[in-house]
Structure formats: C-alpha cells, structure tokens
Amino acid sequence: MWLEKIDIQHFRNYSEASVSFSPHLNIFLGRNAQGKTNILEAIYFLALTRSHRTHLDKELIQFQQNSLKLNGIVHRHSGNLPLEINLSNKGRVTKVNYLKQAKLSDYIGHMTVVLFAPEDLQLVKGSPSLRRKFIDIDLGQIKPVYLSDLSNYNHVLKQRNAYLKSTDKVDINFLSVLDEQLADFGARVIKHRLEFIKQLEEEADGHHSILSNQIERLKISYESNIPIQNSKDIREAFLTILNQNHKRDIFKKNTGVGPHRDDLKFYINDMNASFGSQGQQRSLILSLKMAEIALIKKVTEEFPILLLDDVMSELDNHRQLKLLESIDEEVQTFMTTTSLDHLSNLPPNLKTFLVKNGTIYEKQVD
C-alpha cells in the first residue's frame, strides 16, 4: 500500500497543507523545529488515530484553533481508499471511504504504518508501558479483534478500579463478578500477545543475526504476572490470582495483576539486552522494525508504510546501510533529515521536500 496524498488542516504548526507523495521514497529536509516531524506525525495519526509523541489531543490542534482535520488517499491492492479523521474537544470522528466508523477497531488497519524514531531506542531500557504500547500498536494493526478485546478489558479494569476506590466496604460477590469479566477479556488479550510475540521473535531473530554477522541470537520473552502454563489455562490462572489478591487490591484500591502490568524482555545470546552495549541495543531495535514490516506484509499481504523520523543520525554507517538494504522497493518510505550529506545510494524515483516554518515545498535533488 502507499499514501498518494494528504490534506492537513490545523495540525500542529500547519494551517493548511496538501502534499502528493512518491510511492517509493519521500524525504523531508529542513532545520530543526520547522515541522518535519509533524508531517510524519500527521501520517501516523491518520493511520492510527493517535500520536507517537503525546497522549494529549489538544497539543495536536493548532494554536487558537478548535479542531483539526486530516484527509488521505491510500492505494491498496483492492483499490483507492479515502481516509479522514477529525479531532476536536468533542472527540474523534473517523471515516473510511466517506463512511463514518463506529469503533476504533473498524478504522485501524486500513493504512498500516511502521515508525522508527529516536525514542524507539528507549524500548529496551525504558518503562514497561513503552513496551506494552509497542505491542498494542503493532498487534492492533494486523488483528482488529485484539483492539476490541483490549478495549473491553480496559473498560472492565476501569470499572473495577473505580469500585475499589468508591467504598471502604467492598462487596466480595460483586468484585467476583467483575473478576470474571476481567479474566475473560484479559485471557484473550494475553493469548493474542503471546501469538504475536512468537511471530515477531522469529522474524526479528533472523534480521538480528544478519546485523551481527551471525554472532548474536535474539529472543523475546513475554513477562506476565499471571503464571501461564499453557494458553488454555490463562483464564483460570488469572481468576485464581485475582482472588488471591483481593486483600491487596482492596487495600491499594487498584488492580495489581493483569495484562495492563505485563512486560517484554529482550535477550541477546541469553543476556538481558538492557545490559548490552548501545550498539547491540540499536541493532535490536532495527531488527524489530524490520520484523514489523515483514510481519505486517505476511499477515495483510501488503507492505506497511515506513516512517523514519531522524533516525539516520542515530545509526552508524553499517546500520544505515543495512536498514536501507532491507527496505523493499515496494515499501513507501517517509524520512526526515536535516541534510542529505550522510545519505548515499538514494534511488532515482524519490521526492524531496523542503520544510520551512510550517510550509512544504517540493524540490529537485541535485
């Protein structure tokens, strides 16, 4: 798939912009704080209805404006597909082929994206919430039912926590009813995640082996606070530990176990990657991104759109070369950079844009 064009209204520092893209490589050039990253963020937001930089929607709407609007035309094997998203203080309105979508899971997946940004380098050593977000975004794009199960789980979790906070005299029978619902959706969420991690590990290990000249093997472990013997027993194991934690949850007034507290661990040659060198960690992240592309292609039979936000400056020449070599010519790629000097072997069928003060100019590469 590829994004033919995007129309932007009141997004970040853009009042209005309309840009047509190459189906291959698109490079946004400009000094810092001109709006290069905002373009990639707009594409990401059009695909996923969320930002990778902030969880506050109001930060996305241009200063002194009340709403933003993004329109795009995506080319897929099945034909051209118009996408639209409107954001205001009343919430989001999403449309596919001009038809309003009732649920988030109905919208996400029509345009798949893989983002590689400098903050991704924190995936290994950062907080567990970053790794859960990584799973949710990738898995949600290839398996819409996961988003539905996750949404239902979070809804029941919110109910359970609100009830625990609302009273000092907890009705154990009512709490047990919530436990049953939480275990139903939580078990589904964990099963989806386990299947995804297994597939991701297979793809990422192969890429990491190539990057390390066949020296290193990559493993990914899903770390749950629920003892998982096999996928059939997850619900019962979750229910058991919820029951065992009743006293703790009543005292703390929150839910201490469940997939909302799970984590990922990465291992390089059986060593926790958080103790690895910076070079090893960068190779690991690069391997994950390559694996994301391959996995989305395998499941959806179409390549995702690749967003590279100023990551070339974070990679040495060897990793830059491996990244560029790994990008299939069918993958539409968007890249931001302050200079083309450090980039070599660029394809002839690219488009280059100069970004200055929230305005985008198409330019010719010398």
From Swiss-Prot:
NCBIfam families: recf. ATP binds at residues 30-37. Keywords: ATP-binding, Cytoplasm, DNA damage, DNA repair, DNA replication, DNA-binding, Nucleotide-binding, SOS response. This is DNA replication and repair protein RecF. InterPro entries: DNA-binding_RecF, DNA-binding_RecF_CS, P-loop_NTPase, RecF/RecN/SMC_N, RecF_2. GO terms for biological process: DNA replication; DNA synthesis involved in DNA repair; double-strand break repair; SOS response. Its main location: cytoplasm. The RecF protein is involved in DNA metabolism; it is required for DNA replication and normal SOS inducibility. RecF binds preferentially to single-stranded, linear DNA. It also seems to bind ATP. One of its GO terms (molecular function) is ATP binding. GO terms for cellular component: cytoplasm. The gene is recF. Belongs to the RecF family. The keyword Transport does not apply. The lineage of its organism: Bacteria, Bacillati, Bacillota, Bacilli, Lactobacillales. It is found in: Cytoplasm.
